[in-house]
Amino acid sequence: MTSSKSVARCVCLTGPTACGKTELALELAERLPVEIVSMDSAMVYRGLDIGTAKPSAAVRERVRHHLIDIVEPNDAYSAGRFARDAAAAVRDITARGRLPLLVGGTLLYLRALRDGLATLPRADAAVRHELDAQARELGWPALHARLAHVDPVSAARIAPADRQRIQRALEVHALTGRPLSELQDSAPADDRLEVATIALVPGDRAALAQRIERRFDAMVDLGFVAEVKNLRACGDLTKEMPALRAVGYRQIWGYLDGAYDWQEARRLALVATRQLAKRQLTWLRGDRVSERWPAEAPGLSSTFLARVERFLGSGA
């Protein structure tokens, strides 16, 4: 990477949901002057605390965090905005002589920060109208299947029920004749951050599923349902808004709407979380991650400490 100005460097710790990223990052912060830059598309929203596993006030008092609680839940927050905000945070942290550590599982954010985003066509009302009409007739899963045919890479990253992203990927293909994933891969490089990415990859999927289940139940015990009730009481939110796409929120919202009982809400939330983890792992398999570490490996904290010191200290 060449540039007339110095390039800010940072380490990114990523991996699927519930794999232990936060715990490992906080262990590192006990041993190095680290500040954490959240790379989580849900933690940016105020009021989404319990269901996003947002660090507590006590933790954030002990270890400074960035890009948490920066927008209201009725606002939109994009990957492009994250890239700008995160780059500014990393440079600020570095300028103060401290160590920036990106932590999170929103992998589109990582790509935007590391590689930049391609210049894509603007939304086209006519194309979107046609896609909406097809979805009403065939259903969004059918359009997801079509996406898998024309852009299998994007389809692997997008849930069959994620209407917004399916529509955008098909719209881009209709307007350009090229897959969205191909356009993203061809985004021009510049002097963005130099990021060393470490992914925690669970070797035991059954154990990960159990951890997801335990974590969801713990969130419920902490007041997750009451948190969603408070969001509903705001009056200007719907479960279709981007903030409420975070796993668990939409399912609990449906329960509070009376669409199904609690057991079904819990089941749907767990299914959605497992599907999220699967999509994250699929993305990581196709991404140029610097290193992949077994999430269950012993001595991860010491290994991570040595790796961070080597990268930020020597440039290796």
Positions of predicted regions on the chain:
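Phosphate/pyrophosphate-binding catalytic cores of soluble transferases and nucleic-acid-acting enzymes
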Residues: 1-316
